From Swiss-Prot:
Interacts with RAC1 in a GTP-dependent manner. The active site is at K169. Its main location: cytoplasm. It is found in: Cytoplasm. Transmembrane segments: none annotated. Belongs to the NAD(P)-dependent epimerase/dehydratase family. Dihydroflavonol-4-reductase subfamily. This is Cinnamoyl-CoA reductase 1. It comes from Oryza sativa subsp. japonica (Rice). One of its GO terms (cellular component) is cytoplasm.
């Protein structure tokens, strides 16, 4: 991270109160950790703050003095207003990963509630967590086109292919942008891709479970497909970075690399050769898919440096071993991941 970013954080973060929705999730937990490191006072929302699944947040450095958890639901506007009271900024991270048909209207209503509650309580700046599912799902995009902040997924294509999570993130992001403009809120949108790296929470999330299933060979084959990846710590830093830069508005594509699933599996096998990792590619009769071009320049221009995927995968697996989600079938190297 650049020295300018460090200085920015140290000067602006001290004593400021911000709220993080979905604080106990994979990304939300790292956003909370990053904010605490930077000196912020943090209020995290959860449906049940006393639930043991949120206990890891209270163990973070600085949590005793500067972290509080409160009960809030994105579908309950009154609970959001209470959570945002006295806050300078809001990080709207909360978002389930599913293909539930009800996800789209719930995501839209929840996002509208968050933006309006923030405006009602005098919050000036909101950072919204979108997804590259709102950006890259477009079958008509040229193979030579560069994926950047101007790109949007094709809603009808996502709907027809049952990618309802992508539909939900598209509509939620559009809602956030429209509502923020109406209410005069400053809005920055972080658009992360498949997020890798170590967990702070105890339970597996979508992407860590994805890695575990491939490493254990539970998935018998992998698709002839490419995907975009980014480290969860880079995603958290991106959130804080765009929050702290007054000029940062609009979308910020948060992608570290794009590669074929075969390359991901090759990395896993090289790092952890004793696991029975998935080795067979699904035969779809098509040539091997090629990685697409992308631009993460907007975040690089703000000082963000991206973590190599190999490091993210290594530390994700070590973390899952330490938390008991993967068997220890060979001596684990002593490496810190936090």
């Amino acid at each position: 991270m650049s020295s300018n970013f460090e200085a920015n954080n140290n000067n602006n973060g001290e004593k400021q109160l911000v709220c993080v929705t979905g604080a106990g999730g994979f990304i939300g937990s790292w956003v909370v950790k990053e904010l605490l490191i930077r000196g912020y006072h943090v209020r995290g929302t959860a449906r049940d703050p006393a639930d043991s699944k949120n206990a890891h947040l209270l163990e973070l450095e600085g949590a005793d003095e500067r972290l509080s958890l409160c009960r809030a639901d994105v579908l309950d506007a009154a609970s959001l207003r209470a959570a945002f009271s006295g806050c300078h900024g809001v990080f709207h991270v909360a978002s389930p990963v599913s293909n539930d048909p009800d996800l789209v209207p719930v995501a839209v209503e929840g996002t509208r509630n968050v933006i309006n509650a923030a405006a009602d309580m005098g919050v000036r700046r909101v950072v919204f967590t979108s997804s590259y599912g709102a950006v890259h799902m477009n079958p008509n995009r040229s193979p030579d086109a560069v994926l950047d902040e101007t790109c949007w997924s094709d809603y009808e294509f996502c709907k027809q292919t049952d990618n309802l999570y992508c539909c939900a993130k598209m509509m939620a992001e559009m809602t956030a942008t429209e509502e923020a403009a109406k209410r005069g809120l400053e809005l920055a949108v972080v658009v992360p891709s498949m997020t890798m790296g170590p967990m702070l929470q105890q339970t597996l999330n979508f992407s860590t479970n994805h890695v575990a299933r491939y490493l254990m060979g539970t998935k018998k084959s992998y698709p002839n497909a490419v995907a975009a990846y980014v480290d969860v710590r880079d995603v958290a830093r991106a959130h804080v970075l765009v929050y702290e830069r007054p000029e940062a508005r609009g979308r910020y594509l948060c992608i570290g690399t794009v590669l074929h699933r075969a390359e991901l599996l090759r990395m896993l096998r090289e790092l952890f050769p004793r696991y029975p990792a998935t080795a067979k590619c699904e035969d779809d009769g098509k040539p091997m898919a090629k990685p697409y071009k992308f631009s993460n320049q907007r975040l690089k221009d703000l000082g963000l440096e991206f973590t190599p995927l190999r490091k993210s995968l290594n530390e994700a697996v070590l973390c899952m071993q330490q938390k008991g989600h993967l068997p220890l079938i060979y001596p684990v190297p002593k490496r810190a991941y936090l």
